[in-house]
From Swiss-Prot:
InterPro entries: ARM-like, ARM-type_fold, Armadillo, LRR_dom_sf, ZER1-like_C, Zyg-11_UBL_adapter. Serves as substrate adapter subunit in an E3 ubiquitin ligase complex zyg11-cul2-elongin BC. Targets substrates bearing N-terminal glycine degrons for proteasomal degradation. Pfam families: ZER1-like_2nd (PF22964). GO terms for cellular component: Cul2-RING ubiquitin ligase complex. Keywords: Leucine-rich repeat, Repeat, Ubl conjugation pathway. GO terms for biological process: cranial skeletal system development; notochord development. Belongs to the zyg-11 family. This is Protein zyg-11 homolog. LRR repeats lie at residues 185-209, 216-241, 265-289.
């Protein structure tokens, strides 16, 4: 049994094409066969529409499954006709790239941050091997790549790509000779050389009549004076978009002089000077007013952007830190610029501290920053703090579950990347400790439980301890039986949780931490014999007897303790450990508790221990007979609970108990338990009971001549409920074959 029931995620469904591409991407082995060289090809002669072919390639890259083997499916240009190819962060060799992608007549290729073995020279060599591709390729993004291998230096490697209109080589070891080569391209209109090793921009004059977009963020090795730089820029006759932003490290006054130079760049519609010094509202306003067509100004990390004119609320978009609109624009435009993302998140945190309405639009931008900079501590620290502000308490219920799932997975990645940073771990735990996230949002709960347990074992912060055990207690109820067993099999987890229980018991403290810890142990021992054995071997039984003695009037504590001991009692190999007179005395007392939740679990322990017959009962037989009589009598006195007081993953533990015809009290407890959950949550439990073959078990009991009348009455009630459920839902599933457990002995 488990402590909490599960809920189903029904909202924020992905599109049909997203679902299809996700399935194909994750299950390629179902659709493909392997060639002699290890690459995959589609088994069926399917033809993908061009848009879906592009989408599948991008999905495979995003999911991290694009490699030398899987990219082989795109060798067939009849099945997959690629035009807009995105292979960002893929791990493919030069040969695989050449054979799979270069035969296509691509219009666009984004190969940002592919593995270091695939160099820019390799990519250009492959692309230029296809004459039609030399003309068709219009946009090429090579951010974060290596120019060429040390063994094979490359010069004039761009010149073959005559059709290129847009090129991005940011964060590349790109030098002046490369710029000179690029500036000879006859159709180039857009160039991004941010964070490269370019020292002289004079070659740009070769593009003066056609360059419309120029991005040169953070050119640290530029060796030109301000006057020389402005002299080049002023000759770019048709330039419409200029980015000379920086990371606040330099004191150059190029931005101020550009803004104050009359008539420079008259066709400009977009200017980014974020991170630059000596920028004022007055200068920016005058510059914009002189160019009525301007639509964007970048002012993040400057002293400007605080006037109403530059608020960013109207047609003029502004990145800055003065208000929410500017900050969000910064996160949107600078998602791949680590320093600016950090800066924007820092200011966003202050703005979202007292937020009152759900803002999924902002949360999506925060998640993007986290995804793009997974190993940057300052970004993850600021982002995780913003996530908490944007999802705390009721705010989470206004956020789509897919977005929450994405954000939660980013939090787990941060916890994994920075396991020893206490504030980051605290931020992530604060966000995870949300009913909406823990109960409804799809994410890797098994991984989350492991990460939270690892944190719990390494920290003693009392407030955070409470949150951690609360998270674990809920996550454990959401895991599959196999995952729960795997998690509980980690001995350190059981030891740590028992340590917390021992601490609280010695302090005679009943608080949320104790209750959550007991719930966590309860859920982790559910249908997990290994975890139950760890519990016994680490003196868990002795400790729990002490808990019962220390808190005799705390029914909520008693319920959790007895719930866990029910799980222990389900493991027949451990029955001998529970055959302790003092323990059974406690259980017998609690059997007569006025709280049905307490009496129910006490009865369950006795039902399991007495079900195996007299031969394995190691105490006085008179005690067993007395307990069976009291068990039967107590069950008949139970009132009907108002709500569902327990959740079960399976009815399998009950079926052996139903076969104990010599001990009707045991049968009665099992039937009462099944009737209780089926009446409170018919949709879930009636279907589960039918699926697991419960109908056959119940019918056998009602027709058996030795069935006690009290048991027959309850089983008939369950059968009536099943019949109503089948009539209402049309349920026709064939029962799963179940392995029968050990049968009861008299």
């Amino acid at each position: 049994m488990i402590h909490l029931s599960q809920t189903m995620d029904k909202s924020s469904l992905p599109s049909l094409s997203d679902l299809c591409m996700s399935l194909v991407s994750s299950r390629l082995e179902l659709f493909c066969e392997m060639r002699d060289d290890g690459s995959l090809s589609f088994r069926e002669p399917l033809v993908f529409p061009q848009e879906l072919a592009d989408q599948l390639l991008c999905k495979m890259a995003t999911d991290g499954v694009l490699n030398d083997s899987t990219v082989g499916i795109f060798r067939n240009c009849q099945q997959f006709r690629l035009r807009h190819a995105c292979i960002r962060t893929a791990r493919i060799s030069a040969e695989a790239f050449h054979r799979a992608l270069c035969p296509h007549r691509l219009v666009e290729l984004d190969a940002s941050r592919v593995n270091a073995d695939l160099t820019i020279a390799d990519i250009l060599r492959g692309l230029s091997s296809n004459k039609s591709l030399q003309e068709s390729l219009q946009r090429l993004v090579l951010n974060g790549l290596t120019m060429s291998s040390l063994e094979e230096p490359s010069r004039r490697c761009f010149s073959a790509m005559q059709g290129l209109r847009a090129l991005s080589v940011s964060n590349v070891d790109f030098y002046d000779w490369g710029l000179a080569d690029v500036c000879l391209l006859p159709r180039l209109e857009s160039l991004d050389i941010s964070n490269t090793s370019v020292s002289n921009l004079t070659p740009l004059l070769g593009l003066r009549s056609r360059l419309r977009y120029l991005t040169m963020h953070q050119l640290k090795r530029l060796e030109m004076t301000t006057a020389q730089l402005l002299a080049v820029l002023s000759q770019l006759e048709v330039l419409q978009h200029l980015d000379i932003s920086d990371d606040k490290q330099f004191t150059s006054d190029v931005a101020r002089q550009l803004l104050e130079t009359p008539g420079i760049l008259p066709q400009l519609v977009s200017l980014d000077v974020s991170g630059r010094k000596q920028v004022t509202d007055a200068a920016v306003k005058a510059f914009v007013e002189a160019r009525p067509g301007m639509t964007f100004v970048g002012l993040l990390a400057t002293d400007a952007g605080f006037s109403e004119f530059l608020s960013g609320e109207g047609s003029l978009k502004v990145t800055g830190e003065a208000n929410e609109t500017q900050i969000c624009e910064a996160l949107r435009r600078y998602s791949e610029r680590e320093g600016f993302v950090r800066e924007a998140l820092f200011h966003l945190f202050s703005l979202t501290h007292a937020i009152e309405k759900p803002r999924p639009d902002i949360l999506k931008l925060v998640a993007l920053g986290m995804k793009n900079h997974p190993t940057t501590l300052n970004v993850q620290l600021a982002a995780s703090a913003c996530v908490f502000n944007l999802t705390k308490q009721e705010l989470a219920f206004g956020i789509p579950v897919r977005l929450l799932g994405n954000v939660t997975q980013q939090l787990l990645e941060a916890m994994k990347t920075f396991p020893n940073h206490q504030q980051l771990q605290k931020n992530c735990l604060l966000s995870l400790c949300s009913d909406r996230i823990l109960q409804e949002v799809p994410f890797n709960r098994f991984e989350a439980a492991k990460l939270v347990m690892q944190w719990l074992c390494n920290h003693e912060d009392q407030n955070m301890q409470r949150m951690a055990v609360a998270i674990i207690s809920i996550l454990a109820a959401k895991l599959s039986t196999e995952q729960t067993a795997q998690l509980g099999a980690e001995l350190f987890i059981v030891k740590q949780l028992l340590h917390i229980v021992r601490q609280k018991t010695c302090q005679s403290t009943v608080d949320a931490t104790l209750k959550f810890t007991l719930s966590a142990l309860w859920n982790l021992t559910d249908e997990s014999p290994t975890t139950c054995r760890h519990f016994i071997e680490n003196q868990g039984l002795e400790l729990f007897i002490k808990v019962l003695e220390s808190f005799p009037s705390e029914s909520s504590i008693q319920q959790k303790v007895l719930g866990l001991l029910n799980n222990i009692a389900e493991v027949s190999e451990l029955h001998g450990e529970l055959m302790v007179q003092s323990f059974l005395d406690h259980i017998r007392t609690l059997l007569h508790s006025p709280e049905v939740e307490v009496s129910y679990f006490a009865a369950g322990i006795l039902a399991h221990l007495t079900s195996r017959g007299e031969k394995v009962w190691t105490l006085e037989l008179t005690l067993r007979n007395t307990l069976l009589q009291q068990l039967h009598s107590a069950i008949l006195k139970w009132p009907t609970p108002e709500c569902e007081m327990v959740a079960y993953r399976s009815f399998n533990p009950f079926f052996p108990l139903l076969e104990c015809f010599q001990t009707p009290g045991v049968q009665l407890w099992a039937a009462w338990a099944m009737q209780h959950v089926c009446s409170k949550n018919a949709g879930r439990y009636c279907s589960m009971l039918l699926e697991e073959g419960g109908l056959q078990h119940l019918e056998a009991i009602t027709s058996h001549p030795k069935t006690h009348s009290d048991v027959r009455r309850l089983t008939e009630s369950i059968l009536d409920g099943l019949q109503r459920h089948r009539a209402r839902t049309g349920y026709t599933a064939i029962p799963k074959t179940q392995a029968h457990r050990e049968k009861c002995n008299p």
